[in-house]
Amino acid sequence: MKALVKSKSQPGLWLEEIPEPAIGINDVLIRVLRTGICGTDVHIYKWDEWARETIHVPMAIGHEFVGRIEAVGSNVADFFPGDIVSGEGHVVCGRCRNCFAGRRHLCAKTMGVGVNRPGAFAEYIALPMTNIWRHHEGIDLDVAAIFDPFGNAVHTALSFPVLGEDVLITGAGPIGIMAAAVARHAAARYTVITDLNPYRLELAAKLGVTRAVNVREQKLGDVQKELGMTEGFDVGLEMSGNPAGFRDMLANMSHGAKIAMLGIPAGEMAIDWRTVIFNMLTIKGIYGREMYETWYKMSVMLQSGLDISPVITHRYHYTDFEKGFEVMSSGNSGKVILSWD
């Protein structure tokens, strides 16, 4: 089968012919139809320090996908050939304390699809049946392909109650934009998103945020005054990993506010902990998706009218993957989809 493979310890990916994956008695074989390019994939493509330390070559990469089931193992009773499915990108051990307690997203022995085991940038992928999510009938395949990052957005945005609250989102990348849309759909009063990239701020505006703020041009304090806010934001969603963005968030939260933090800083990050203590802020780290509560929430939100399709801005055939990675690296894109059919 054709696959995009990290076959050399240098920048780039290579389209190669590799064996079709075999399945065990508890596995599902999926014919991949669409994939999304993730920031993780860009790191692997560029072969940065994290990728060099993490990826063992050769490795077929990619973890955002939708496909059609082709075959199932003999123990698989709940999935059938023809089902349209995606897969949870974290394969857990099933035996640790967190897994036994139903907190599988906290498994310390997680294996990442397309990172620690063969990925979805291929014509076929095999996964354990416990990692398979069947989509509702009629779902747009491009949207289904980005359930992984959409799940990051939902997990972050719904970590704290947002009904009637004022929500600040720092970082207007695709996940930040989707998180803002989720908070709005969940009845937040105001959703304000910040960034420095005009393209992405414009994209955020298309998905209905209350304000898309270029912090080079406008201060959050002034935005609060325009909206009639007097005590700061109630909920913060830190999606950027940018120290300045996080410090700006801390300075604009109400006393007792809650912050969900998905953005990963490049290194150690200094903040004024006195603000956290005296303002009694709660900061919660977010990683991945809750298995599978987040997936239920994603499906229900789409079925109840949430439209995230505008966040998908570019589409290519997998043979044109270089164009997809180029536009992703430019910063002037939302989600980028590769077609495999």
Swiss-Prot record:
Annotated compartments: Cytoplasm
SUPFAM superfamilies found in the cross-reference section: GroES-like, NAD(P)-binding Rossmann-fold domains
Binding residues annotated for Zn(2+) 1, in chain numbering: 38, 63-64
UniProt keywords, alphabetically: Cytoplasm, Metal-binding, NAD, Oxidoreductase, Zinc
Superkingdom of origin organism: Bacteria
Assigned EC number: 1.1.1.103
Function field: Catalyzes the NAD(+)-dependent oxidation of L-threonine to 2-amino-3-ketobutyrate.
This protein's name: L-threonine 3-dehydrogenase
Originating organism: Solibacter usitatus (strain Ellin6076)
